[in-house]
Amino acid sequence: MIQIETIFDILWKGFIIGVIVSAPLGPVGVLCIQRTLNKGRWYGFVTGIGASLSDIAYALLTGYGMSFVFDYVNKNIFYLQLFGSILLLIFGIYTFRSNPVQSIRPVSTSKGSYFHNFITAFAVTLSNPLIIFLFVGLFARFAFVSEGVLVFEAVTGYLAIALGALTWWFGITFFVNKVRTQFNLRGIWMLNRIIGGIVMLVSGFGLVFTLMGESLY
């Protein structure tokens, strides 16, 4: 029988995972902002949709792979959550110290079709399989993959990841579009540092609580 509390737990964990995966301004994030500024908000948003679809593909691949080692996961949940927190902390530090402005490339003056903007973002994101390690860390940290999960619960979890990712892209394109006259290269740099700082803060708390034997999430 499906428990409401279980569904709610899956929903919020999946949503947070989707946001964390999408938020750092890597090549696709910068591309999304560029297209929002140069072509319009919805061109930026479909760029985010393309990135989200690729992320979901990697999330499914990661979850499927981890499903074969349930016994190992259950027996070593402490170490896996510790690993997940450390990996997220490293990811946050990298994001904080990186300069996304270096990823800026000239954008074609031609808007192109929505599908073209979607598929190019999908391809760029798909070309970075290292995101699997981020999903492993997140799934371990949030205990997202567990034994005996119903199909409905699994589908709900991955849909929540997609919703979190899409919410981020919808929000960032809305924000950039609203402040387009004031948004510059320094704005991109500052936004990325804020994101990195938040990820470091959350992962730091997770690391401390794990070492204390408590559950932060």
Residue ranges of model-derived segments:
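Selective transmembrane alpha-helices of multi-pass membrane proteins
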Residues: 73-103, 161-172, 176, 183-217
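Membrane-embedded alpha-helical segments of transport systems
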Residues: 50-61, 127-129, 161-169
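Membrane helix-loop-helix hairpins that form the core translocation module of multi-pass transporters
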Residues: 42-117, 175
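Short alpha-helical packing/oligomerization segments
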Residues: 150-166
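Alpha-helical transmembrane segments and their membrane-interface junctions
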Residues: 132-144, 206-215
